[in-house]
């Protein structure tokens, strides 16, 4: 918008100057925004502004009053410029506050939920098992999942005619290389490099050709070994009973040992616990027997010691093996082993 300069000829120049200054100050103080303020600055202080135009009124003033009038016009321009700058700062601050207010986050509003991860039930179960045996003085050892026939079978007194060597039970790469069917080879490797006394557990993945409600081609095992002088089956029963009662958090849990057969232990036993679902009354989970089979165990066979160079006349030992998924199913009430490997978040979130 362009304004014509105002040259007052009917009023005294000083009076006209005072009126314009008063009008300008009032307009500046009432300016609602920065664009309006800029228009006022141009209107009054621009090259063709109303205050600037008053310099042309100097010829209406006597020579004696001309310096006084010129000084008054300059002072009026400076004062108005200061008021415009002050008003500009106020408007800029108000605009900043308005913008901040519009961008403010209302912390009282409900937030967006975050997906929080958690430990897999098999991982939780492994951690509980390892914690108990670490407390009992056992070391944790690991070994290769791709094994040779010697460490997986022969060194464990499993003859070539044993069913475990059949193609339908074992994943073979060639005649001498396979995916380990248990973590017992770790025990052989440790005994080959460390002498007694030994207390170790070997957790890890194992592989067998099997798949149904209670079996998968890949699952987790923890196998344990203790070798020392004067070791008895009573020691084996004591450590396993303590473990099972600690794992299921039941001091009154009944544990029984049944005679069994494993080629790498003699004598051998299957370990059962009172059904944790029905407390021994009989239900679908335990097949109405009141008992659940949970692990196998026994005293280390002398031929196993011979393969690793340990004197079986001086040293005795016991070994045991348990399925991690089996214990997880019993602890968490899961009836299908395959659920652990389907990556269904609806299932997994129940444990976090």
Swiss-Prot record:
GO-annotated cellular components: cytoplasm
Pfam families: Phe_tRNA-synt_N, tRNA-synt_2d
UniProt-listed Enzyme Commission number(s): 6.1.1.20
Cofactor note: Binds 2 magnesium ions per tetramer.
Disulfide bonds: none
Keyword Cytoplasm: yes
Origin superkingdom: Bacteria
One biological process term in Gene Ontology: phenylalanyl-tRNA aminoacylation
Gene3D superfamilies: Bira Bifunctional Protein, Domain 2 (3.30.930.10)
Keyword terms: Aminoacyl-tRNA synthetase, ATP-binding, Cytoplasm, Ligase, Magnesium, Metal-binding, Nucleotide-binding, Protein biosynthesis
Cofactor: Mg(2+)
Entry binding sites for Mg(2+): 266
Family note: Belongs to the class-II aminoacyl-tRNA synthetase family. Phe-tRNA synthetase alpha subunit type 1 subfamily.
The name this protein goes by in its record: Phenylalanine--tRNA ligase alpha subunit
Organism: Nitrosococcus oceani (strain ATCC 19707 / BCRC 17464 / JCM 30415 / NCIMB 11848 / C-107)
Chain's gene name: pheS
């Amino acid at each position: 918008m362009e304004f014509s300069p105002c040259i007052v000829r009917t009023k005294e120049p000083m009076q006209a100057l005072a009126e314009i200054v008063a009008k300008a100050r009032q307009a500046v103080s009432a300016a609602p925004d920065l664009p309006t303020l800029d228009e006022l600055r141009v209107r009054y202080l621009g090259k063709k502004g109303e205050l600037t135009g008053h310099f042309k009124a100097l010829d209406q003033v006597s020579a004696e009053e001309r310096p006084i009038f010129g000084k008054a016009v300059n002072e009026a321009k400076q004062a108005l410029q200061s008021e415009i700058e002050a008003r500009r700062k106020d408007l800029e601050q108000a605009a900043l506050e308005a913008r901040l207010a519009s961008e403010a986050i209302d912390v009282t509003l409900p937030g967006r939920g975050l997906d929080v991860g958690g430990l897999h039930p098999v991982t939780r179960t492994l951690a509980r098992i390892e914690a108990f045996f670490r407390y009992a003085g056992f070391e944790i050892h690991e070994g290769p999942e791709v094994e040779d026939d010697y460490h997986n079978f022969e060194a464990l007194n499993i003859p070539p005619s044993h069913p475990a060597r059949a193609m339908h039970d074992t994943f073979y790469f060639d005649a001498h290389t396979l995916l380990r069917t248990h973590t017992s080879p770790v025990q052989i490797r440790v005994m080959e490099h460390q002498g007694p006394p030994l207390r170790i557990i070997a957790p890890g993945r194992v592989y067998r050709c099997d798949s149904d409600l209670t079996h998968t081609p890949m699952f987790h095992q923890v196998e344990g070994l203790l070798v020392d002088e004067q070791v008895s089956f009573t020691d084996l029963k004591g450590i396993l009973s303590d473990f099972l009662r600690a794992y299921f958090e039941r001091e009154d849990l009944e544990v029984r040992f049944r005679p069994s057969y494993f080629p790498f232990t003699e004598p051998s036993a299957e370990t059962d616990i009172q059904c944790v679902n029905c407390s021994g009354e009989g239900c679908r989970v335990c097949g109405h027997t009141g008992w659940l089979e949970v692990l196998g165990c026994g005293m280390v066979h002398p031929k196993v010691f011979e393969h690793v160079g340990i004197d079986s006349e001086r040293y005795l030992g016991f070994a045991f093996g348990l399925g991690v998924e089996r214990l997880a199913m019993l602890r968490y009430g899961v009836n299908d082993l395959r659920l652990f490997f389907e990556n269904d978040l609806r299932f997994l979130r129940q444990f976090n």
